[in-house]
Amino acid sequence: MKSFPLIFAIFLTQASANQEEIITKLQTLDWKKEATAYAIADDKATITTSENDFLVIGEQASEYMFIMQGHKNYKPDAAILRVQGPEVDSQVIYTINEIGYLTQDDWGENIDKDQMLKDIIEGTIETNKQRGEGYLDLFVDSWAQEPFLNKKNNTVYWAIAGHDAGDNKFINAKALKLGREGYTEILWIGSPEQFTSSETALEPILANYDYSEGFQYADYIPGQDSVAAAGVGALVYKLATGKAAAKAGILAAAAIFAKKFWLIIFLPFVYGWKWIKKKLTKNKE
């Protein structure tokens, strides 16, 4: 059976679940509101928050996704909600993936940007058929920024522009921060007005995210550490489209499919979130 990326909506339509019930559930989560550094993923990385942020970690982040999505297919390590400041209403989702050290030498041969966009558009339409009642259909319009690899900071960036069935427009900017044991997928969700480029949107987020000592990309030990079955180019193609890159090789492609890397998460900015955020910030000290 053909696999497609899973595309998720960040909030339910007014015809769906009761908003007060959602608020009650969200208020029971263990929101970290103090501006400080928080360890995640068994101390393998640290997120430093500002006074503008609410943070949930581990199982609480997974529960947040379940409350907002109605399923348990996506389990991040952390999620940040911007409750004030210049990026108010934007959100950041962090997921650490331990797949082994990723080499960068396959980037050029596996990144076909035009074909990738076509596959993303088709996959999103197909996924809409699987969406539960009360969730808005999503549509991808274009690259907001084509995928590129910054070898200086060992990070891949790309961004998608789209809209939902209510004609609310959104941008999803993604960074893959490479580490010794794999990568961290960092997803920024906001409005087109807040977006200039993936690097600009994600730069302060990446500056406040650090692998712990011993887990950084430069800490890799050749001949000792595990190496991923595919390079970063094949991985990005898979993450973006739900398909294996043609040049990745049969064994590498099989490994990617076995680990279900094709889950791509779209959490579009919608204006119903402002109402939820207002309720939550009543308790912010």
Give the residues covered by each predicted segment.
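Short, well-structured beta-strand
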Residues: 84-93, 134-223
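Hydrophobic h-region of N-terminal signal peptides that target proteins for export
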Residues: 8-17, 274
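Sec/Tat-exported extracytoplasmic proteins
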Residues: 57, 120-135, 206, 210-213
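Sec-dependent signal peptide recognition
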Residues: 1-7, 262-264
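C-terminal single-pass membrane-anchor helix
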Residues: 228-285
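Short N-terminal segments immediately surrounding and downstream of signal-peptide cleavage
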Residues: 19-36
